[in-house]
UniProtKB/Swiss-Prot annotation:
GO terms for biological process: cytokine-mediated signaling pathway; production of molecular mediator involved in inflammatory response. It comes from Equus caballus (Horse). It comes from the Eukaryota. On IL4 binding, phosphorylated on tyrosine residues in the cytoplasmic domain. Residues 26-231 are extracellular. This is Interleukin-4 receptor subunit alpha. A motif (ITIM motif) lies at residues 695-700. One of its GO terms (cellular component) is external side of plasma membrane. Residues 369-397, 441-468, 514-536, 606-674 are annotated as: Disordered.
Length: 809
């Protein structure tokens, strides 16, 4: 092959470049849309694959599908580098018109399509938009873009856009669906003093059209006056702020003026030298006003307003002054309240500042101790009156009965022995242990040892057996007795004497409470007996008598004698008072007192052998029969009589060392090595007990020989006839013979007539006792002497606590 000539090389190169350019022609990416205004024109728009000069490279040809129509050409224009728009003119567009479209790039057909204008309608944009202000409203108007004869004139709807000129995002859209191209906008709906712009566009909804382009915009300035309703909240808020500012400014101004001007004015009330006058002594020392009664302090702002505006606050101040006066005066207090009180400030007196006065003065009246006066009254009379007693009886039947009983006992005891005086003080109550039985004697050498208690029937009541050491026994502390009771003080003189069984049986409760002995001494248990600490405070004379007997250490003894022992005791004392004058009267008193003592020893639970009419008699000095079983000596009171053991073989029946049947251990004065020594307290109490024992001793002894009075009688058919003798019957007329022991002198006669035959059935019947329940009385002797009535020792024994029948003397 040959080579090309150098002259042909340039033309070949140009042909290759042209072919390459032809093969790389432009392409249409997509046909955007074709719309018709439905009047005279239609618009088509498409996008090229690369930037293209639409008017130089492209052309659009369109032709109505009709044989007689011409082929028309449209030169496109560039909207953008790659977007081309072509406007096609059409005459008398109708709904049935259809056009054929062809896009050419030179001789190359890019695309072809058909287009029906009635189905692709895009109305024209409204024109001539204007804004008018009418009565606080804005009227927007525009013109319809279609003539009246066009089909779209009545098919258009509008959309109005109102926005702030400076802020396009703040806008409002109004949809106008009616035919009239107008819009009314209320000025209040828009912000005042703001510039707004409006624009409008149209659409033919029935033709399936799209929104037209926005019309040219119009602007206006929104300025209007707000109505009163809208201006009122703002005005109120502004007014409140102004008023608050004025008040604060006035307050601080007044405070500043007060500090700089008002406080500088001299005022005597601010002076520290103020004398306080103290009055109204009826106010209590501790009676301070409560918070509710204290007058409220006036706040500072009120004080300032009062000084500045006195006329406005005058009425309120008067009410406060009246209320403060009422609180200060207070209610009237009765004279029964405390006499000493503190003093309260009622007035202030202004003094010159030169004078120095104390800022406060308190006047108090000291309380007078009334206890010193009571002590002085007690020194004058040992029996305090009921008025001075803090716990006296209440006025009423109980108080009257207590005072009558007091006067009766004082009269009876005074008639018996005028040397008793008025002393009725009780023994000290503060001692830790009080002896249960007090031994009275003239000196420490004559103190008698206490007896031992033995059961009446050891087989039937083994728990009642007592074991006692040879020394003196220690007993429980006596229950506390209120010593401030006037009736009890009156009884204390007589209660200091040994009590007889008749007096003990006058109160059934007394017999029950006599069972409270020392826990160290074994005795029969009494489950129904309440503890001594739980006993109520004595209020009646019977209860006080019971408490006194408990203090004296009386042993328990079951008794169920009827009430009325007080009357029997009073009768006995009256009869005993005549013993000093004549023998028969003394014997009658002795027998009545014996019947009283016999009646007090009745036991309701006794059964078995029936006693005879003489078994319930009073046998104070009768020794036990040799043939009879050893009785259990359960003595109650010995009335201060000195008793010696009988010098007979019967003493061997009652050995003192037998643990099964302990009995009395008779000894002679000065021979008992186990005799306990009396303490100073017991020696002091013995002097007082001598006074009480002298009453009974004078009633039961003969004034001629100093021996006991005896009653001789005989029993006939169960009845005891008593014959009283004017003397003791054993040594009357024989003054030279020394007095023998009462026990020896009162041994039972050989005839077998017991001493208790002198006890009449009448006296037993008066106490409500039957012959079947007449117990025997036994006596427990104690060493001592009976040389004179002024030195009569007092021996108090213990009662058996068993449920069997007991007898006391």
């Amino acid at each position: 092959m040959g080579c090309l000539c150098p002259g042909l090389t340039l033309p070949v190169s140009c042909l290759i470049l042209v072919w390459a350019a032809g093969s790389g022609s432009v392409k249409v990416l997509r046909l955007t849309a074709c719309f018709s205004d439905y009047i005279s024109a239609s618009t088509c728009e498409w996008k090229m694959d690369r930037p293209t000069n639409c008017s130089a490279q492209l052309r659009l040809s369109y032709q109505l599908n009709d044989e007689f129509s011409d082929n028309l050409t449209c030169i496109p224009e560039n909207r953008e580098d790659e977007v081309c728009v072509c406007r096609m003119l059409m005459d008398n567009i109708v709904s049935e018109d259809v056009y054929e479209l062809d896009l050419w790039a030179g001789n190359q057909l890019l695309w072809n399509s058909s287009f029906k204008p009635s189905r692709h309608v895009k109305p024209r944009a409204p024109q001539n938009l204007t804004v008018h202000a009418i009565s606080h409203t804005w009227l927007l108007t525009w013109s319809n873009p279609y003539p009246l004869k066009n089909h779209l004139w009545s098919e258009l709807t509008y959309l109005v856009n109102i926005s702030k000129e400076d802020d396009p995002t703040d806008f409002k859209i109004y949809n106008v669906t009616y035919m009239d191209p107008t819009l009314r906008v209320t000025a209040s709906t828009l912000k005042s003093r703001a510039t707004y712009s409006a624009r409008v566009k149209a659409r033919a909804q029935n033709y399936n059209s799209t929104w037209s382009e926005w019309s040219p915009s119009t602007t206006w300035h929104n300025y209007y006056e707000q109505p009163l309703e809208q201006r009122l909240p703002l005005g109120v808020s502004i007014s409140c702020v102004v008023i608050l500012a004025i008040c604060l400014s006035c307050y601080f101004s007044i405070i500043k003026i007060k500090k700089e001007w008002w406080d500088q004015i001299p005022n005597p009330a601010h002076s520290p030298l103020v004398a306080i006058v103290l009055q109204d002594s009826q106010v209590s020392l501790w009676g301070k006003q409560s918070r509710g009664q204290e007058p409220a302090k006036c706040p500072r702002w009120k004080t300032c307003l009062t000084k500045l505006l006195p006329c406005l606050l005058e009425h309120g101040l008067q009410k406060e002054e009246d209320s403060s006066k009422t609180v200060r005066n207070g209610p009237f207090q009765s004279p029964g309240k405390s006499a000493w009180h503190t003093v309260e400030v009622n007035h202030t007196i202004l003094r010159p500042e030169i004078i120095s006065v104390v800022p406060c003065v308190e006047l108090c009246e000291a309380q007078v101790e009334s206890e010193e006066e009571e002590v002085e009254e007690d020194r004058g009379s040992f029996c305090p009156s009921p008025e001075s007693s803090g716990s006296g009886f209440q006025e009423g039947r109980e108080g009257v009965a207590a005072r009558l009983t007091e006067s009766l006992f004082l009269g009876l005891l005074g008639a018996e022995n005028g040397a008793l005086g008025e002393s009725c003080l009780l023994p000290p109550l503060g001692s830790a242990h009080m002896p249960w039985a007090r031994i009275s004697s003239a000196g420490p050498q004559e103190a008698a040892s206490q007896g031992e208690e033995q059961p009446l029937n050891p087989e039937s009541n083994p728990l009642a057996t007592l074991t006692q050491s040879p020394g003196s026994l220690a007993f429980t502390e006596a229950p506390a007795v209120v010593a401030d009771n006037p009736a009890y003080r009156s009884f204390s003189n007589s209660l200091s004497q040994p009590r007889g069984p008749g007096e003990l049986d006058s109160d059934p409760q007394l017999a029950e409470h006599l069972g409270q002995v020392d826990p160290s001494i074994p005795s029969a248990p009494q489950p129904s007996e309440p503890p001594t600490a739980l006993q109520p405070e004595p209020e009646t004379w019977e209860q006080m008598l019971r408490q006194s007997v408990l203090q004296q250490g009386a042993a328990p003894a079951p008794a169920s004698a009827p009430t009325g022992g007080y009357r029997e005791f009073a009768q006995v004392v009256k009869q005993g008072g005549g013993a000093a004058g004549s023998g028969p009267s003394g014997e009658a008193g002795y027998k009545a007192f014996s019947s009283l003592l016999a009646g007090s020893a009745v036991c309701p639970g006794q059964s078995g052998v029936e006693a005879s009419s003489g078994e319930g008699g009073y046998r104070p000095y009768e020794s036990p029969d040799p043939g009879a079983p050893a009785p259990v000596p359960v003595p109650l009171f010995t009335f201060g009589l000195d008793v010696e053991p009988p010098h007979s073989p019967q003493n061997s029946l009652l050995p003192g060392g037998s643990p099964e049947l302990p009995g009395p251990e008779p000894t002679v004065k000065g021979e008992d090595p186990r005799k306990p020594l009396l303490s100073a307290q017991q020696a002091t109490d013995s002097l007082r007990d001598d006074l009480g024992s002298g009453i009974v001793y004078s009633a039961l002894t003969c004034h001629l020989c100093g021996h006991l009075k005896q009653c001789h009688g005989q029993e006939e058919h169960g009845e005891a006839h008593t014959v009283a003798s004017p003397c003791c019957g054993c040594c009357c007329g024989d003054r030279s013979s020394p007095p023998v022991s009462p026990v020896r002198a009162l041994d039972p006669p050989p005839g077998g007539v017991p001493l208790e035959a002198g006890l009449s059935l009448a006296s037993l019947g008066s106490l409500g006792l039957s012959e079947e329940r007449k117990p025997s009385l036994f006596f427990q002797p104690a060493p001592g002497n009976a040389q004179s009535s002024s030195q009569t020792p007092l021996t108090v024994a213990m009662l058996s606590t068993g449920p069997t029948c007991t007898s006391a003397s």
